[in-house]
Regions:
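Residue(s) in the substrate-gating loop at a strand-loop-helix junction
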Residues: 138
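Canonical Rossmann dinucleotide-binding motif of NAD(H)/NADP(H)-dependent dehydrogenases/reductases
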Residues: 1-25
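Alpha-helical segment proximal to the catalytic Tyr-Lys
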Residues: 118, 167-171, 229
Length: 247
């Protein structure tokens, strides 16, 4: 399950899982974007389908779990990657914007972990089968970045939630990790990536470039598969060295 899989980054993560043999479901609000994502991502021999869902609705998430269990029989990997960004100056952030950003970036992840988690915990307790939850975080969830106040705040909460769940569900074999992208060209970043900001970011990145969506594939497969079976509660940073640099 790849929530937010209609976007560029999570779409590539979904494709990587499908290429590795997973029966993969991408999830998004927009059916047209879902159809376009399937056209873009489908490859011979890969099973990739779309399910509509708004992560701000608990009822829709509950129904999504039921539909996928009915169609696929089981759920083993959950990727939570739905997200919004905003560059509104701090003193100008309205209640409406704040609530929207938190609803998608923070509460959407929490609700998805709850709704899918009920199934995963029940299965683990009855059969001993584990699972992997990958919550997509952000470099701004580690160190606050300028101009993205609400986004940084919500992503920091996702990092904290994930570590809590790793502690809570680890004994059941349910691994919970944060995949932390650095700067990747994505639709939600267009408003904040001015030419001046791009130059600053590149100058602060040892590999001296933005990431490519393909470069999230390896980290996704590691966290999703038995290759990462002893990894839980981790923040796997894929940022070209951005977080390692000070001056």
């Amino acid at each position: 399950m790849v929530v937010g899989g209609t976007g560029v980054l999570c779409g590539r993560m979904a494709q990587a899982l499908a290429e590795a043999g997973a029966r993969t479901v991408i999830v998004g609000r927009d059916r047209a974007k879902g159809s376009a994502a399937l056209e873009r991502l489908r490859m011979d021999g890969c099973e990739l389908t779309f399910e509509p869902c708004d992560v701000t609705s608990r009822d829709q998430l509950h129904d999504l779990v039921a539909r996928v269990l009915a169609s696929h029989g089981r759920i083993d990997v959950l990727v939570n990657g739905a997200g919004l960004n905003s560059a509104t100056p701090f003193l100008e952030i309205s209640d409406e914007e704040l609530e929207r950003m938190v609803a998608v970036n923070q509460l959407g992840v929490m609700r998805a972990c709850q709704e899918f988690g009920r199934y995963l915990v029940e299965r683990a307790e009855s059969s001993g089968e584990g699972a992997s939850i990958i919550n997509v975080g952000s470099s701004s969830g580690l160190t606050p970045l300028s101009r993205v106040f609400t986004y940084s705040m919500a992503k920091a909460a996702v990092h904290n939630l994930t570590r809590n769940l790793a502690r809570e569900w680890g004994p059941l074999g349910i691994r919970c990790n944060v995949l932390v992208p650095g700067f990747f060209p994505a639709e939600q970043n267009r408003e904040i990536l001015t030419p001046e900001r791009v130059a600053t970011i590149i100058g602060h990145t040892p590999l001296a470039r933005f990431g490519d969506a393909d470069e999230l594939a390896g980290a996704t497969l590691l966290l999703a598969s038995d290759a990462g079976r002893f990894i839980t509660g981790a923040e796997l940073v894929v940022d070209g060295g951005f977080s390692a640099m000070t001056i």
